[in-house]
Amino acid sequence: MLSRICRQTIRGAATKTVPSSKAPFYIERELKYGAHNYAPVPVVIERAKGIYVWDVDGKQYFDFLSAYSAVNQGHCHPRLVKVIKEQSEKLTLTARAFHNSVFGEYCEFITKLLKYDKVLPMNTGVEAAETAVKLARRWAYDVKKVPENKAKVVFANDNFWGRSIAAISASTDPDSYGGFGPFKAISDPNTAAFHVEPIQGEAGIVVPSPGYLKGVRELCNKYNVLFIADEVQTGLCRTGKMLCVHHDDVRPDIVTLGKALSGGTHPVSAVLADDHVMLVIKPGQHGSTYGGNPLASRIAIEALKILIEENLAENATKQGERLMKKLRTLPKEVVKEVRGKGLLTAIVIDKKKVDPWKVVLALKENGILSKNTHGDIIRFAPPLIINEKQIDEAFSLIEKTIKSFV
């Protein structure tokens, strides 16, 4: 079924491309030899710089997905390219069987920046989330004294933190977690932690009600439950603060980071917590061959410095407000809702009137690359280096596209 859908998409796209387009060759080869676990927008990207990408035919696009917010610093940031070249010529991997000369520097930098005692390095966002869950369960048995094999971790409805077995098994039953459900679940004496995205990304840029995260913090304090904030997509300046939870002035017990921690150049993720949580993990109980490697550590330090020194949180706030204001002027016949924070924004398409996938394809034709989620929601999340002129230029293309469906 997925193969047929993918091929139909490609055929449909091919009719809109020039006869000399190179894209079908690359797409067909990928479909022939690669697993069909994605249904991408039919464009083949060859190079990128800053907020722009170019396809194999040389056409330029605004990147309004940023690899799901991994490229906050912009594509191929020269400072990141420089440290990658320098470190890769010196030392790339030792595994954690030995110390290396960069990892400690990275640990000190990120823990002092985000004000946690310890960091546990991993590679992908889902690895970081699973590490956080594992930490919470170990803490529940060792510190909270939950009976063995009884510890629970509560997840928000519509959560998404990856596609591993643990991630897809996280319950999103509305009867358990809707309304007063979180209160009942957190008050269970066997509950180890509550895991939540400050803004749900894959669910469609769902921004919680004011006071929600403060309420979570208060409930977790009351019932001795760990508060885990999944900042893999929302963190690192995307929403206008270094961490999204900073908007609500709350401090989670565990924070997970990924994506923009490397500026889109290398798989790097992290779990941050204080000693009373982190030190329940003993040598040999958790780890990763690549986690904390010298190359990843050097990249992460530089990626964080870029966010700070280029004032990307402030720019995300400024340009996000500008973009949201403009998006709200789009025709209501097509766009039912606009939502977001900072430069993590989305429009909700009225799918009774317009096919959202056709909107995505039309945006591509007009020079905007984005992707829909949950069918009718199109996410707009450009690199945080975008300026006012570029926001205005990109919006004119978005507006042109949306108005073509009226």
Give a label for each model feature.
Residues 2-6, 10-406:
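Conserved N-terminal phosphate-binding loop of PLP-dependent enzymes in the Aspartate aminotransferase
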